[in-house]
Amino acid sequence: MMKASFKGKFDVDKSGSVASLTFNAGNAKLRATMTDASFVAGPSFNGLSLAVEKPGFFIIDYNVPKKDVRFQFMNTIRIAEKPLNLTYIHMRGDNRTIVDGSFVIDPANKLSANYMVGTKNCKLKYTYVHGGIATFEPCYDVAKNMWDFAISHKLYGGDNLKATYQTSSKMLGLEWSNNSKSTGSFKVCASMNLAEELKPPKLTAETTWNLEL
């Protein structure tokens, strides 16, 4: 089976698009992704990436024009019968390594950590889900010694509203999204820097279409 998806992003300054094709190869998946840079000046390798994925185990991405490889490995172990999800990511070109972990205490509570190896970049996050509808996520940035906050609420019909606030940049964000596994998804975002003079919020919109071929 082959699946195709098309993603378009639109904002005041610029617009862009991404198309991908995914093929099932046994218990693995092969994926080719192209951006609009692949076609602007005629067909080219610009914006082309190739990937092989075994869901839940690994993803290997190859950026064709940059000749760069990104490795991602996933694993789950159990501590006191509770899952600890671990992800290891290495970008060869940037020589960066990221370790990410999340510990699911119960369906309503989760602890997460994200650390870039060799730096002070580390974020700690707590996720609380109330009644399966409302989610509250405080996040502590160790390097900046700052807190970020996110609150989201599920609505009828699959819609989701989310508000975020970054204390370091004083950036306030609002997001309305809807995700459908069969047809696709959309997301509309508005952001405003509260540290600057009063300006109209910056608006962006994303939409994704999924097809089975």
Curated annotation (Swiss-Prot):
Q: Which residues lie on this side of the membrane: Cytoplasmic?
A: 1-2, 28-31, 64-69, 103-107, 132-143, 168-169, 212-213
Q: Which GO terms describe its cellular component?
A: chloroplast outer membrane; etioplast membrane; plastid; pore complex
Per UniProt, subcellular location reads as: Plastid, Etioplast membrane; Plastid, Chloroplast outer membrane
> Can you tell which superkingdom this protein's organism belongs to?
Eukaryota
Q: Which keywords belong to this entry?
A: Chloroplast, Ion transport, Membrane, Plastid, Plastid outer membrane, Porin, Transmembrane, Transmembrane beta strand, Transport
Residues crossing the lipid bilayer are: 3-12, 18-27, 32-41, 55-63, 70-79, 93-102, 108-117, 122-131, 144-155, 159-167, 170-178, 202-211
| A GO BP annotation | regulation of monoatomic ion transmembrane transport
Q: What InterPro entries does this protein map onto?
A: OEP24 (IPR034626)
Chloroplast intermembrane-side stretches of the chain, per the record, are 13-17, 42-54, 80-92, 118-121, 156-158, 179-201
What is annotated about its quaternary structure and interactions?
A: Homooligomers form large rather nonselective pores in plastidial outer membranes.
Q: Could you say which protein family the record assigns here?
A: Belongs to the plastid outer envelope porin OEP24 (TC 1.B.28) family.
Role according to the record: High-conductance voltage-dependent solute channel with a slight selectivity for cations transporting triosephosphates, dicarboxylic acids, ATP, inorganic phosphate (Pi), sugars, and positively or negatively charged amino acids.
Q: What is this protein called?
A: Outer envelope pore protein 24A, chloroplastic
Q: Which gene encodes it?
A: OEP24A
